Amino acid sequence: MPASIGGLPLPRICPHFLTLRVAIRAHLTDHVHIGLSGGPDSLALVAAARAEGAEVTAICINHNLQEGSAEVSERAAAQAEHMGATALIRSITVPPGSMEAQAREARYAEFAQLTDTIWAGHTMDDQAETFLLAGLRGNPAGMKSASRRPDLTVIRPLLGVRRADTHGACTELGLTPWQDPQNRDRAFRRVAIREQVLPLLAEIHAGDPVPGLALAATRAAMEGEALEFFVDKRRGEWADGFPVRLAAEPHALRRLMLADFLRGHGVRVTSKKIEAVDRLLTHWHGQGGVAVGGGAHGRLEVVRVSGKLEITG
């Protein structure tokens, strides 16, 4: 282990930090870009990547959602630079709507302006919380270690690492991370799950529920990835309308195919729309078309014509 990273000396014995270093090795490249909030997870991730010899560019996003957010970004950037990383600060405007979702999309859009691959500090605990949140929305799913968006790949090297290790690593290295006050506000569902639901599950389960939930999330993510693979392979089948014969496909695969078909025509996909369109395949009795939103030329509608589904509007 190096004696220091930049101007930060490294202690000889630091088991939490070693856990992080081992975890990231499978994802390591010569130069990595890391989304740095200044919190324990991303700060420890920057330190681990630097200790493993990577050149690091830390991208600090000021979402302008909290008082003092500019100072938080500046402090995080200074900490990264002290560890020998390059730091960039970007200020963004988050559109109205679901704050967590809109902030994430705005942040990823900004990352995509700077790199094609970004590391995120999500841990096993985040994975378990995400699985429960997604389940409440009727779509139990997990984060993948590598998520590919149209313009950005998100790498999550710490999904197998506990939050206690990132916090412990910061303590071992003498780093003082930013503690987001919103992480204590139970008005946010994720915080309520973290502070109320998971402790109750631990009591009922008579043990830590996080590893099992995280494993379920990982399996859901892998199964989803397999289905997406088949959709990618078969996309040409619905390039000129969605064939009615695909009604024979398994429901889960057919839903993804329909979602891909709709997105290809600029439709904002929801479960309700997919189910309504699916009935044109599986419960056909001559009914009219299904409205799926507005397009550039007006109302969009899916209709069944001559053995296939078409979008008009």
UniProtKB/Swiss-Prot annotation:
- For this UniProt record, give its keywords in alphabetical order, as a comma-separated list: ATP-binding, Cytoplasm, Ligase, Nucleotide-binding, tRNA processing
Query: In the record, what lineage is assigned to the organism producing the protein?
Result: Bacteria, Bacillati, Actinomycetota, Actinomycetes, Mycobacteriales
In this UniProt entry, which cysteines form S-S bonds? none
What UniProt notes about the protein's domains is:
The N-terminal region contains the highly conserved SGGXDS motif, predicted to be a P-loop motif involved in ATP binding.
- Record's protein name: tRNA(Ile)-lysidine synthase
Q: What class of enzyme is it?
A: ligase
Q: Predominant location of this chain?
A: cytoplasm
- Short name of any one Pfam family annotated for the protein: TilS
Q: Which reaction does it catalyse?
A: cytidine(34) in tRNA(Ile2) + L-lysine + ATP = lysidine(34) in tRNA(Ile2) + AMP + diphosphate + H(+)
Q: What is its EC number?
A: 6.3.4.19
Q: Which GO terms describe its molecular function?
A: ATP binding; tRNA(Ile)-lysidine synthase activity
What NCBIfam families does the record tag this protein with? Answer: lysidine_TilS_N (TIGR02432)
Protein's job: Ligates lysine onto the cytidine present at position 34 of the AUA codon-specific tRNA(Ile) that contains the anticodon CAU, in an ATP-dependent manner. Cytidine is converted to lysidine, thus changing the amino acid specificity of the tRNA from methionine to isoleucine.
Q: Where in the cell is it found?
A: Cytoplasm
